[in-house]
Amino acid sequence: MQERHTEQDYRALLIADTPIIDVRAPIEFEQGAMPAAINLPLMNNDERAAVGICYKQQGSDAALAQGHKLVAGEIRQQRMDAWRAACLQNPHGILCCARGGQRSHIVQRWLHDAGIDYPLVEGGYKALRQTAIQATIELAQKPIVLIGGCTGSGKTLLVQQQPNGVDLEGLARHRGSAFGRTLQPQLSQASFENLLAAEMLKTDAHQDLRLWVLEDESRMIGSNHLPECLRERMTQATIAVVEDPFEIRLERLNEEYFLRMHHDFTHAYGDEQGWQEYCEYLHHGLSAIKRRLGLQRYNELAARLDAALTTQLTTGSTDGHLAWLVPLLEEYYDPMYRYQLEKKAEKVVFHGEWAEVAEWVKTQ
């Protein structure tokens, strides 16, 4: 039974999106996991905690015996059934625990006894995590071009369309502003970093990559923060700024934040609850910048938002949202971005409309 334990093997697992049957407890998995991993634990959180206490008080042999006692009979059979099904569904997958220790070896042995030979990650999640960290450090050393521009400039789409582009907001499941949340919950910080590393490895492996194309992001994207090694390189990068007409930006924002978000919420929750979730999403976004706007201006814009939602509910038209979106851009988002851009003006090497920037990026 071949085990994979070299640095190149670990990288190959991430590049290939190799299915990983992660047998750690759910609490460990939630703190950090690899992108292609599914959690089928040997022990649940309570069982793991009980074995941990036993280990501290009585030693490893007693802890092992306690684990076998807790995972026995019907519980063991249920978990065996889940592992067997996962192995058959993912014949080219691999087992993983925290450090490639007893848990993955126990599951591997039980599967072997049931007629299934399945490899495991020698070194476990810890080894894969270190590989992800090191890969990000190395790959971040390549030159970077940042795509900048005011809100609604189509920066994310431009990055997505580049073969050497990495969509940081897509990986973070957040669009980086007060209205940036999506219907998918954000990953833990470690899981986000692992996903980013895997994406960079895959992008680099599939071409002769000379430079990265990334969106000009701040350190935080929602609750996730960029790895320091990448953030540091981004502060040194050149910037291409998209300068589209205001009307074009409004069309994009209408599509992305009103039409698409309303569709996504109703698709996920049904018409009635979806509408409520959509309304709360917009109000929450505006409320998040209440202090920046000042109470009086916030109340004015919130009233316009309510009126726009009433119009949208009764007529289906999203045009009413311009009454609060336009001043929000003119008074808050655009001045804020221009101020940030002024501080790094010496790094700006190209200005142009969306298509011009997209064409320029191809020449780099």
UniProtKB/Swiss-Prot annotation:
One of its GO terms (molecular function) is tRNA 2-selenouridine synthase activity. Disulfide bonds: none annotated. It holds the Pfam family Rhodanese. The active site is at 97 (s-selanylcysteine intermediate). The keyword Transferase applies. Monomer. Belongs to the SelU family. This is tRNA 2-selenouridine synthase. It comes from Escherichia coli O127:H6 (strain E2348/69 / EPEC).
